[in-house]
Structure formats: structure tokens, C-alpha cells
């Protein structure tokens, strides 16, 4: 579903009418059969600028190959309520994370007031729709340099790693969700992992585990087939250069 027709095929309107008539059920019907290109996702995300719910739509930086990296922010950034931050597609060969983040941002930009407005009264929301557009286009796990961006949060050798740090410092999120995709046709469809680095503040770890449990319970109630992953902890899963571990160490409840 690439090319001029974009995410919605040839029916995509030139002007996005923000009539707020989409429901969550509508979103599932808009999921494409074929993967969109990085430029498709970028161009469609720019359309969100027309939504009055958007606080900021920022080109927060550029990928190794010069593609814009977009951060979408909703809400008034009231310090009295939590900020929830979604990050998608550090790994370019995990397309579902980008599509999910795009649909999430689209729902909050265009969704019905009955579904969206009560949530935005309780949280500030930020969505980093696509961290690794070069990897998405190449179908590769790493960025254009072949680097696994989810192992670059300590050294910050890559531009995308630096930009993720910049976004985090801009937002100061209460909760951070790092979105991935796992292959294989098994019985476990949804996997959730909490931070495991032992230097994380105990309160952040405890809150992350509560959130992990709540998410798994909600998944299993709605769809089933949810599971905790990376447990028990290993040396690899405790790596401080992994997104959920790194930003939990910096005080954000993380998954």
C-alpha cells in the first residue's frame, strides 16, 4: 500500500477532515495489507498538523540518510498529570510497531471526542512514530550504519540514538513504552517486558511491574494470548543500553 495512494489507497483525501468520527473499531479496518514505505508514514504523519488536538508536531531530528524523525505531542503538558510517551521502530524490520504508533497518533488526532477527549484530560501524550525510517525501507534491524539502535542508548554513536535522548529530555515522560514486533506464528501474540537493570530506582521498577501486569491483564481480557517476556532476568535483558532499561534508570516507568 505504497505510492501516491498511501496508507489508505486511492481513497485518501487530499485534505484530512478532522470531523472526529473515527472509533477504535474503525482503526482496525484501516490497517493495510502491504507495508507502507517510510516516506508514506512521514507524509501521513505531517497531516496531523491540521488537528487542533496536536500541541506540537516536530521534526526533532534526521536519520542517517536524512529522513525526518517526527515527534507528535498531544495535550497541554499540564505538569499535574502524567506524560505517556510511545517510541516505535528502533528496529526497521519490525513494521507493526510503526503502523501501531501511526494508528495510535491518528486516533488521538482524529478520533471521536467520546473516546479521545476523556483520555487527554488525564494524560499528556507523545508519540515518536518512527525512529528508524532507513531500516524500515531496507527491511533491516539496524539503521543505515547497520547499528542496533536499541543497544546505543549509552554510547549514543548514531544520530537516531542522540535524537531519542533529545526527545526524552524534551518530554520528561512519566511512562515510556518502547514498541517492537516479534516474528513467528506462535500462540503468544502480545509480549510485554518491564525494565530489569538493577540500578533502577525500586519505585520505578515496582511501578513498571504493576503496569506490565495491568497491560497483560487488559490484553488477555480483550484478545488473549498475552505474556511477559525476558523473565527471569538475564545479563542481556538487564543491559543499560536497552531503551526500557536506560530510561527507567532515568526515572520513567517503562515497558
List each model region and its residues:
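M14 metallocarboxypeptidase catalytic domain recognition
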Residues: 1-255
